[in-house]
């Protein structure tokens, strides 16, 4: 059956004792072969999928609440509820359940699980029912003892609840309460407190509906004022009738809605303020009370949401300039509470709720309210705005982009939020922290949508950097015009720290937008002024900002840092910190350590060439000496490019065995005379020997030795002492690697390709021709390398690329070292 009578929502109780909406569908009961019994089936109204398939277990306790709810537990921690649109549908399904369990449909609970001994169970079942004493003043103590003794036993609780319900006993007890209060009978009032508290712990919806009715609820609260453990009674009724007043900011025409609002407020008050905090053993006994409040709130939000006249009047008065301040304050507080109630809704219902508010113009109303002078009204408006941003940031972004086409930057909604953040009068900036969190959510690309037609990220970030970023950074720019912050009081520093944190977030998550802004506005220089602040937390914020930029390893940022000497304030802060071992000291050292470990060559050279004198005496960490060593290695490679050349040759012969290399070697084989091979002349052994030397000797120490022996080796080579052995072939070239000036047979183009195997010569070395020779000489630990024209021509570009991986081009290095 698919009519509205059987239309239901399926709820499950989560770990936080909150009801989760599992969907809307139509319920039916049928025999399910797989489950071997009659079962409840709920099929989704959207696609017909099965939302619920639950066998009606003869031993499961089902409860009917508020005429339209059926609640039960399928496992120890798995509670289910069906919320019916109509009472008739609930009654039909309840009859089916009672029919399976053999119960009278007039009961509101079929049974409860029994965990007592067989003897107690037999005694309880053998008794026909629980007989209550007459409701008289002299028998109150007896009633209180009966209630207390029934609570531990599920069956006795069931019988007590039925007796209380059938005999109208609660109303009689409340009449006795009025008599006791008139007579000031304190003993009787104490007994009534225990009785009413015990009735709450029975956890029965039918009893709650009697107790929370309009004529009974205040007397129930009165009974709970007289706690025997307190010397004086509480004054809850006085608070509810005189202090807590119901303000009907917009007239509510529906009397049922008005009564539901009153009831929910009072029941919530009973739960939060009147009832004592439940013990561990009593906590689950009030689950029905939690459910009662929850479903009341859902019902209130639904009824208000459906009343278009009410919401239209609400937003009209909110935005009307003629509305006085007190009235507007009440309207905003109502809207805030309305949004708070919506948090009880499930995601799909909440989505419809906020869509309704959006269609009514809630964002336009907030824009008007945030422009007002009343601090309390603005605070409430901020809370409403936070509900909207946290639930649907895309809706807010779409609104502000549309309004930017019509309004000036000063009155844009986001700019109003930024101004309130900047102007927060709270010394601890509580409101500013909240607003900064909302801004972060709005500019976070992770929650931005991308569709086929447009990309929200691109559009919104372009809008934000064009219309809003200058407002956000204004306090930072105004306070950093000198070498030290203009204002260094705590509140200003707190605000600047929030702004820098958001900018750091932008550096991490945005790309070219923030890069262009930082470089064009010189933002990093301004932020680093804050390292001179007396407040360490602000200095650390500035260091985090720079560290995030360096961590990107972006050469645009690196050139910007070097061009403007932006390590200077960092080094100055490090030296001013002295020998103190604190967060600033660690943060700065970590920044330099990152440059060293990641081998950021341009920054390494910049730091050593400009700030080494100030850092060379720091020896309690090896970071700066390590940076110096990195720098010297770079210079060494620039002065001795043969190191890169040798590494690329080694890498080529040891690791690269692709098809092209094999073809080259075959070509070489067929180009070699048989006589060469007969003489036992090895084609590649020199590289093997060089391999062993490279493995045994560190390249740095090897070149240091060469440097010391430079003069003597030059003389030996130049005077022709180097012996040449083996037969020469026109197809071979000879190349020495003794010193930068000892390249005897490099081709004229060798200086253009310092990384090619046949030309390990340094820039500026004149390449002199000599008769081609196939011999290799090793003298003073130096190795001559044999290579071939075929390899040279084909692999020249590839090996040049390999050498570039080791270090930047020489022209770039020479610029850095100059």
UniProtKB/Swiss-Prot annotation:
Q: What's in the keyword line of the UniProt record? A: Phosphoprotein
Annotated WH1 domain ranges read: 1-100
Enumerate the GO terms in the molecular function aspect. protein phosphatase activator activity
- Entry keyword Transmembrane helix: no
- Is tRNA-binding included in the keywords of this UniProt record? no
For the region Disordered, give the residue spans. Answer: 670-818
Oligomeric state and interaction partners are given as: Serine/threonine-protein phosphatase 4 (PP4) occurs in different assemblies of the catalytic and one or more regulatory subunits.
Where in the sequence does UniProt note compositional bias of the Low complexity kind?
Answer: 729-775
Organism, as annotated: Danio rerio (Zebrafish)
The free-text function statement in the UniProt record for this protein reads: Regulatory subunit of serine/threonine-protein phosphatase 4.
Superkingdom as given in the UniProt entry? Eukaryota
Q: What is this protein called?
A: Serine/threonine-protein phosphatase 4 regulatory subunit 3
Gene3D superfamilies documented for this protein? Pleckstrin-homology domain (PH domain)/Phosphotyrosine-binding domain (PTB) (2.30.29.30)
**Known Pfam families for this protein?**
EVH1_PP4R3 (PF22972), PP4R3 (PF04802)
